[in-house]
Structures are given as C-alpha cells and as structure tokens.
C-alpha cells in the first residue's frame, strides 16, 4: 500500500484519532468540530489554520485511501466523520497512540512520546514506547522511522511516514554548540519566527492545492 498524504490530510487524520480516543462522547465529529480540532493551538506542531474547504478536501483524500470517511450508521442530520485506520492496519492501542502524536506534533523522542501520549495510552516504561515504535517501523511498508541524532542532542527522534520519507535538515553549528544569543536580538528573532510560521502555513496550502490538482489526472 503506497501512502503519501498531504499535510492537511495528516492533520485531519491525527485530529480524528485523537478525538476518537480522548472524547468518545463527542465522536464522530461534524465538519465544524473537525476544523476546530485541526486548528487548536494545544498539542499541535505546527499550528495550522485550515478552513472548511481544506478539511473537506483532506477528508476526500483520506476517503480515497480508506483511512477516514462519513460515519456509518450515525443518527444525525449533520454529516459526521470518523477515522478508519483499524480497518486498514489493525493497530494495537500503543501503536495508534504513538502514531497519533507523531501525526499531530511531528518527530518526537521516546521520552516526549511517553509524556504526550498519556491521554491516549499509558506507557509504563520507555521500553514500551520503543516496542510500539518498532512495530510501526516493521510494518510493510514501514509507517515510522528513526531519524539521525542531531548534533548537541541526547536522543534521536522518530517520525511517521504517512506523508512520505522524512529528511531532517542539518542543524546550524551555532545551534549545536549552544552559543548564547544577544538579548537585543530577541525581538528580531521572534518576528522572524512568526514570519517563518506564516510561510509554513502558506506552503502547506500551496502543496495541498498542487496535490488536489495532481489527483484530478490520476
């Protein structure tokens, strides 16, 4: 099975998994609730601003790959949506918990995963987290990978492969050696970080538009 989701599809899928486990009383989700789940500021990296059209398009792409779709048997006049990963992959709860955090927050260390999966699944030890990661990496095709450890860091991170392979950029030397920043530069750096975040959101939108255009010819 060839998996290559857009960033919007990754976010929608992660949000559906999260709400399925943490707030089952409000699940499946209406389109409006799903938009809010995708755009919430907590437990999301990066924070995104998807509108209803973008989420609807992402749902269409996920439905084509049998990963999500309208809820079956829902007794409501409002269409609600659910994730269907169990039907495709038959994940264990530890696997789905780890995958959910990777989808919503990007690459993570085992320690970060243990802390951030607490509402999804309680891992007794880091070895339990590693076991879930190994199972994801041993799937065919692999659904996660171990990233090279960056200079100046103690732990390696793991990433999901639902959006294709992941290649981490080289870390600048000053970041690895811990050179102190000039306090006078803090405001300028904050502005630059805001601009980078905005550019990332624009790139996501453009990539999704290109992906939707490409799919018209498949």
Question: Where do the protein language model's features map onto the residues?
Answer:
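Eukaryotic, polar/proline-rich low-complexity intrinsically disordered regions
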Residues: 1-10, 22-25, 43, 54-57
């Amino acid at each position: 099975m060839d998996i290559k989701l857009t960033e919007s599809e990754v976010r929608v899928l992660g949000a559906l998994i999260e709400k399925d486990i943490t707030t089952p009383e409000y699940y499946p989700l209406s389109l409006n609730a799903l938009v809010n789940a995708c755009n919430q500021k907590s437990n999301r990296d990066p924070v995104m601003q998807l509108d209803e059209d973008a989420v609807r398009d992402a749902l269409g792409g996920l439905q084509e790959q049998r990963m999500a779709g309208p809820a079956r048997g829902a007794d409501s006049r409002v269409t609600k949506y659910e994730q269907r990963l169990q039907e495709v992959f038959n994940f264990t709860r530890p696997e789905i918990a780890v995958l959910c955090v990777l989808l919503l927050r990007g690459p993570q260390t085992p320690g970060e995963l243990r802390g951030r999966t607490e509402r999804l699944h309680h891992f007794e030890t880091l070895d339990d987290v590693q076991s879930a990661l190994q199972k994801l990496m041993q799937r065919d095709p692999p659904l996660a990978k171990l990233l090279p450890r960056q200079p100046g860091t103690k732990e390696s991170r793991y990433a999901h492969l639902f959006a294709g392979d992941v290649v981490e950029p080289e870390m600048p030397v000053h970041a690895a050696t811990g050179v102190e920043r000039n306090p006078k530069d803090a405001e300028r750096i904050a502005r630059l970080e805001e601009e980078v975040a905005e550019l990332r959101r624009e790139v996501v939108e453009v990539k999704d538009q290109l992906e939707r255009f490409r799919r018209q010819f498949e």
